[in-house]
Design a protein with these regions (language model features):
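Outer-membrane beta-barrel porins/channels
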Residues: 25, 57-59, 64-70, 92, ...
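Charged interaction patches that mediate protein-protein contacts
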Residues: 1-2, 161
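N-terminal, post-signal peptide beta-strand-biased segments of exported outer-membrane/organellar beta-barrel
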Residues: 2-11, 16-122
Length: 413
């Protein structure tokens, strides 16, 4: 079996993983990457993934605010629409610079955007009373390292670890009805919060390079945030909105991921992975007044009701190298939805295909695509955690298409 030929297919397998991670459950968009540390030599890699989810909500109904307005939208002066395209397309960049410090120690500086979500339902349906536009964005600046020990004549054991500095930002707009605690007329309020945090990860790997066999297990810690910012246009004084300073404690979830690959025939590689993410730790995110300027400090102004269930992502595939320049790989991935009925984040099935072109030993470019569906279901946030939610509503959605495209280039030196 040609080890180098098999390894090329393994590179394509890693590429397809970037397309899958960019549409994972919860609001994860990019997972940690230790694969580059297993390659020999110094390298710089950069690329990105474009994802286009086509989630459409239908038969939207059941809003108490909508009923109170007689079914007439106060903005358009027309009956409320009952369907809307919810999801927005997005781009996820990623970059790494890897260096061999010794024969056994390697480190990589990395940039990625681990968390993100963007939905926009506009102001035509009663969903605007839950949220009009919601956006979470992030930046991660990290370092991952690997130290290798001999574990036999042809095998190695590695200790993997890393740290990251992360920035997290959350934005939301929603329609405020006159019956809110702050009174006033129909108006759009906005939430804008952000914070920074530090996280870590630790893992181990076992490999037999001659057979392109590798198994890795990595734990990623949760990150603790104290989000701070303002809610605007909620409190009205003298005919104008007064910003309310707010804060919220929230943790991004911990996770454990297992990856495995092995050569199965000359120029053929099989690979797979399983990842668990502790999304059930995120239930209700309260935004409380952080001072006494407008309302008593500690008073909950608004909440983000998620009540997620844990996420599971299972992926498998096969790669093949045709010659010294071209390799291909295909994958099948299932991502369990994190929704418990309050959101439209249901199961995702993805089928991926990618190719790796390497014209010489110093440069290679990878292109991968994935297509699949977001599974059907229903959402109902008229009752949250056993309590009536006056601004909630009900809706349905079918099996909707999702597609992704990833492009990456690498230079070795």
């Amino acid at each position: 079996m040609s080890v180098q030929r098999v390894k090329m297919a393994g590179i394509v397998a890693a590429l397809l993983g970037s397309t899958v991670a960019a549409n994972a459950g919860g609001f994860e968009r990019s997972s940690q990457d230790f694969d580059i540390l297993f390659e020999k030599g110094n390298a710089v890699e950069a690329g990105g993934t474009f994802v286009a989810p086509q989630r459409k909500l239908k038969n939207i109904r059941g809003s108490r605010v909508g009923a109170a307005t007689g079914g007439i939208n106060p903005i358009t002066r027309q009956p409320y629409e009952t369907s809307v395209d919810e999801a927005k397309s997005y781009w996820v960049p990623k970059a790494s610079a890897k260096f061999d410090l010794t024969d056994d120690l390697a480190c990589a500086a990395q940039y990625r955007q681990p968390w993100g979500i963007h939905t926009d339902v506009g102001v035509d349906t009663v969903r605007m009373f839950t949220a009009i536009d919601q956006k979470i964005s992030s930046n991660d600046y990290g370092v991952n390292c690997s130290y290798r020990f001999a574990a036999g004549e042809k095998s190695y054991f590695r200790i993997l670890g890393g740290v990251s500095y992360q920035e997290l930002k959350g934005e939301q707009t929603k329609m405020i009805p006159p019956g809110s605690a702050f009174g006033g007329t129909f108006r759009i309020g906005s939430l804008d919060v952000e914070d920074e945090a530090v996280g870590w990860r630790l893992g181990a790997a076992y490999e037999i390079p001659e057979y392109a066999m590798r198994a890795t297990l990595v734990y990623q810690s949760k990150l603790k945030y104290n989000l701070e910012g303002t809610i605007d246009n909620l409190a009205i004084v003298g005919g104008r909105g007064i910003p309310i300073n707010v804060e919220s404690d929230v943790d991004t979830p911990q996770s454990v991921e297992f990856k495995f690959q092995t050569g199965i025939a000359p120029d053929w590689l099989a690979f797979g992975s399983v990842k668990w993410t502790d999304w059930s730790s995120i239930t209700q995110v309260d935004f409380d007044a952080s001072d006494n300027n407008v309302i008593r400090k500690g008073t909950t102004i608004t909440s983000l009701n998620l009540y997620y269930q844990d996420g599971w992502t299972v992926s498998g595939g096969v790669g093949h190298k045709f010659n010294d320049q071209w390799s291909v790989a295909g994958t099948v991935t299932w991502d369990r939805g994190t929704s418990t009925g309050l959101t439209s984040q249901t199961d995702v099935w993805l089928f991926g295909l990618g190719t790796n072109y390497k014209p010489n030993e110093q440069f290679e470019v990878r292109l991968a695509g994935a297509a699949g569906w977001l599974s059907s279901g229903e959402l109902d946030d008229t009752v949250v955690n056993g309590k009536p939610n006056l601004t909630g509503s009900k809706g349905e959605f079918g099996n909707d298409f999702v597609g992704g495209l990833s492009l990456t280039a690498k230079v070795k030196f």
